[in-house]
């Protein structure tokens, strides 16, 4: 009987020890699971923070690229404007040079007789008149072409004068007819450049 009691007591202690080991093992496993979950959660948090940081860095890079592109566009536009301004200045200079080189001061023909000057003597403001009238050489060529339509077609320029009427000016040109002694064609050219023969056979 005593042995039986002793055996039961020993069995109870053994089972109790086994149960305690099982609980400790469960607690250990639970702690491992909790630790693993915590580490996994921390990893996710770190990954998320890293992704946010990477996205922020990418955003900074994009903004920097946009800023650089904008600066490049502005520089290109400035360079283009500067080039256009230089080109316009060059064109203006060329136009001014051409205008200066094409300008011909009024002059008389060789051995000119006072024909136009005698018919239309001008005592007004010559500078003001010339500012209103077309280029002298252009007007002279137009008048010569018009004079050659009447009689001989090889008339020679003689002299010029200026006629003024109500503030409007005209050139008055005389052209000698080499085939008719003492005869001249009188041609006017107004401020619009219109040439007109007023007397094809003026006798000096």
From Swiss-Prot:
Keywords from the named record: Cell membrane, Lipoprotein, Membrane, Palmitate, Signal
Subcellular location per the Swiss-Prot or TrEMBL entry: Cell membrane
Lipid-carrying residues in chain (S-diacylglycerol cysteine): 18
GO cellular component, one term: plasma membrane
Biased composition (Basic and acidic residues): 23-70
Segments for region (Disordered): 17-100
Annotated lipid attachment (N-palmitoyl cysteine): 18
Signal peptide: 1-17
Bilayer disposition of the protein: Lipid-anchor
Biased composition (Low complexity): 71-100
Official protein name in the record: Uncharacterized lipoprotein SAS2259
Source organism (scientific name): Staphylococcus aureus (strain MSSA476)
